[in-house]
Amino acid sequence: MSRFFATGSDSESEESSSADEITPKAAGTTLRQQALLLSDDEEDTKRVVRSAKDKRFEELTNLIKTIRNAIKIRGISKCLEEFEQLCRAFVKSKTIVDKEGVPKFYIRLLADLEDYLNQLWEDKEGKKKMNKNNAKALSTLRQKIRKYNRDFETEIASYKENPEQSADEEEEKDDIGSGSSESDDDDDDDITAKSFMKKKPQEEEKKAPEASKFLKGAADEESESDDDEDSEDWASDSVGSDSESEDNDGTAASLAVVFLKKDVGEKASDRKKDDRRRRHKKKERIEEEAEEEGEAEEGGWEKVKGGVPLVKEKPKMFAKGTEINTGVVVKKLSEILQARGKKGTDRAAQIELLHALAGIAAENNLGEGILVKIKFNIIASLYDYNPNLAAFMKADMWKKCLDCIDELLDILFNNNNIFIGENIAEDSENLAISDQPFRVRGCILTLVERMDEEFTKIMQNTDPHSQEYVDNLKDEGRVCGIIDRLLQYLETKGSTEEVCRVYLRRIMHTYYKFDYKAHRRSLGLQGETKSEQDQEESEGDDSAIIMDRLCKFIYAKDRTDRIRTCAILCHIYHHALHSRWYQARDLMLMSHLQDNIQHADPPVQILYNRTMVQLGICAFRQGMIKDAHNALLDIQSSGRAKELLGQGLLMRNMQERNAEQEKIEKRRQVPFHMHINLELLECVYLVSAMLLEIPYMAAHEFDARRRMISKQFHHQLRVGERQPLLGPPESMREHVVAASKAMKMGDWRTCHSFIINEKMNSKVWDLFPEAKCVREMLVRKIQEESLRTYLFTYSSVYDSISMETLSEMFELELPTVHSIISKMIINEELMASLDQPTQTVVMHRTEPTSLQNMALQLAEKLGGLVENNERVFDLKQGVYGGYFNRDQKGGYQQKQGYQRGDQKGGYQQKQNYQRGGYRNQNQSSY
């Protein structure tokens, strides 16, 4: 029998006895006073007197409730305002808090709020979506709460150690007497659970309304215990309400009963007994509920526990006894696909359903056509698992995708009677087994291209310095294998456009890889072990042959400019990577890509920049210093090499782009294993600039109109000169600057020691495939350019110098020295002549000395100063406030200009005459 149908006589007798017990009457009580005592309506309308503690704590709980509601709707600015009010209210409650201690609900709010703000602060994507006010309020509130919580570190630490126990103690000891405040606290607990995902057991059931509590039977012990708890938690509440009723009665006896109700010791012991009894009853109630759940039959009510996912049975694909044929499977497939893309669709469950459907089709031998169609939809569902374009596939989904594509290609290779294509309409599909070949709508090339893009996303979003990146990179072999299989399939059954597309995919996985085995074969080296030799013999063509075949097919057959442009750039990159400088240079010049590359899309521009950089590095390895400098000039002079090569974003440009543009640019980044070493690139550029700039500076030392070949190199020189104390070089740039200073003096050995040493070898030169050849080339170039610099700098000191002496100084062969000096004389860089019998260089001394150069510069500057003074004087004398007419003023200016022109021409002619005479005089002396 239900407990709600208990007899009411016991409860009535209890009510009457309790009423007699509560309202004893003195002898002098009048009827009017009895009527006033029994007037419930008037008693309800009386004002309730509350203590200061209740008022302050209720104010705090109301503010806490508002804060939690603001947290619920992510209103951080509202949260900040309410938190400031809460801090002020807590200061007002300081006297009560000093007596009673800090309330537990206040500590819980501080701890939860700090955790919530830290969670929001770490969520970078969520911060970007915030509006300006919330973002500003978040940083302000986070600083305030961290500073404010320092005063409550011990309380917060104890709460975090056992949050459930703290919540129980709060409900038992710090509960406010009014029902409204209790409901507020319950609401606060709900908000906390939802906001911070902390599951707390609900300890108290919702209390019944006031009208129903008088109709409960005597057997309802839980309601009595709850009423006792409410009446005895705060003594001040009960005393306040009882004192009001006694004032209405007006008798001294009732007042005595109220104030002399129980002793303090008895009250404390009774409270402990009630707590123990209440906990015991709660435990019994939980055990009874567990037993009832265990004995419940099927079809009855089931209690759902929060946070525990229910294990759902797999839905049945077909009803029992249904005949499985192609039409039924296609209908079921369309039903599954109708939910694709809709809100609330479980994508993982949809993929499982499609796998189950494929298994059913295979079990019933419905043919390969329906299997191909289901596989197409499984792969498409795997791609749709992450609706966000920026998100990458998880490892398990990626493995499933590769397996499904391999299975699909197996079916297509094993069955030549299957035709697939995007131009096949769904109505004209032939999926059933018949004499006609299978016709399935779909495009295997699109699926493989999307798979390749997903692989790139995975590599972009993986930490390049982790083992996970290496593990993911191992999948590239499988990706290339799938592309090769698709290439074989489309060569027989695909169109020309499809073949060009799949060829480009194969090229993009080949062009940046150095073929070490082909390089070893070109040098005549063989594998060290027998297995390596057998492997080299069994391997197919070199990458150069593969690239040449694929690219030439695209050059001849492709109709789109983009695929042809990408193929040309990849072909040039591959030639340059393998030191085929002349083929790479000729292909770049014949393609004329540099004329219209600015109109290409950003990924193609990034590929063009990478190709130009690789072309410059190739020219440097071959000793073409000027070509290397010209190829690298545009990339390095911009100061944005990292961004132009698609290897990262610059922080200084972050303010110029919004969040959406930043995501787009991140998707264009090149994976880490395809990066070009930026330090190597900068070193090659600076060394090339040094070999060009230092001799040029020595040749035009006194030329005021001297141009700079490399601004970045001059900037590094100025930075080195500004340093007050020069120590040994440490960074790559410091090594190049120190080498440049040594080359200025013609000291090639010091320059060589700064450019080629253990530190520079480990950082730069050992990264080249032919490091030894590169170092030998560098030594030769340093010797030659140091010789040129020496002759430019000290030609005014010598009357003649022996070429044999120069050969010994710079450790160059005599023919090489002869060749260098001859070129300098032919190009009119060095005013000298060669005396063949004596093998000496005779200086002509046509160039002025340093003192004469300084005098000429001073004369030119004085001439410019005189001209400026005359111009200022003319302007001052020519302004007469409109007194003269325009003709007179114009005539005056013309006259002055005529005189100035004559003087200027005569001065310049005189100067030139003097210089010419000086030179003629010097020449005649020889």
Curated annotation (Swiss-Prot):
Q: Where is the composition biased (Acidic residues)?
A: 220-235, 287-299
Q: Which GO terms describe its cellular component?
A: eukaryotic 43S preinitiation complex; eukaryotic 48S preinitiation complex; eukaryotic translation initiation factor 3 complex
- In this chain the PCI domain maps to 672-848
**Compositionally biased region (Low complexity):** 890-919
Q: Name one GO molecular function term.
A: RNA binding
**Can you cite a GO biological process for this protein?**
formation of cytoplasmic translation initiation complex
Where found, per UniProt?
Answer: Cytoplasm
Job of this protein: Component of the eukaryotic translation initiation factor 3 (eIF-3) complex, which is involved in protein synthesis of a specialized repertoire of mRNAs and, together with other initiation factors, stimulates binding of mRNA and methionyl-tRNAi to the 40S ribosome. The eIF-3 complex specifically targets and initiates translation of a subset of mRNAs involved in cell proliferation.
What is the protein's quaternary organization? Component of the eukaryotic translation initiation factor 3 (eIF-3) complex, which is composed of 13 subunits: eif3a, eif3b, eif3c, eif3d, eif3e, eif3f, eif3g, eif3h, eif3i, eif3j, eif3k, eif3l and eif3m.
Protein name, please? Eukaryotic translation initiation factor 3 subunit C
- State the species of origin: Danio rerio
